[in-house]
Amino acid sequence: MTQPDLTAALALNGPDATLKLYRDWAATYDTTFATDMQYNLPAHVARAFRAAGGIGPVLDIGAGTGLLAQSLRDMGLTDPIDGLDFSTGMLERAAAKYLYRTLIHADVTQTLPLSRQYNGITSSGTFTSGHVGPEAFAPILAVALPGALFALSINQRVWTENGFDAALASLQHENRIHDLRLIEVAVYGTAAAAIDPGHADDRAWITLFRAT
């Protein structure tokens, strides 16, 4: 069996392929990817959320194994965090860390089985190649309270190509979001160059805004 890796993840095409890759990767994701590649993006998102005054309850989109929630806890957030992911294998790993109030198995591009209850929406690594596009903004906004703070990482490789810039501009124009600002960050640390030089220099926008 081919070992799941970043290249395979960024080339995903369709829900079946996504479920298979993350089912196979879940057990080793934290070590073979997050640690070895110095995957700093979850910490960047958590830091931006906290610095902007983010509070809970928080919905962590694409929660994975809980890396972003762990960073939020490490930075002092004690409010409830709920985690949502398409992969049950990844959610099982997250559950074992006892970081979340509840975990939800759902497709973020569809209407979510949740009420409008969140003061914060976070996401790290979900809005990238082969994953989720701006079509997820509407379902996420539907569960955010007025004034809720969003802190979402969006890989720069897909920012314009996949229409994230246009989608956010449209949401601003429709007065559905406000106070949009971008923070540029490196996705990985220096160790990534020896493991995956093709992606070691990847950059992302931490996209901060509030629901109207």
PLM regions: where:
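Class I S-adenosyl-L-methionine
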Residues: 176-212
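Class I SAM-dependent methyltransferase SAM/SAH-binding core
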Residues: 59-111
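A short SAM/SAH-binding and catalytic strip from SAM-dependent methyltransferases
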Residues: 119-133
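Short "lid" loop at the C-terminus of a central beta-strand within the Rossmann-like core
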Residues: 155-160, 185-187
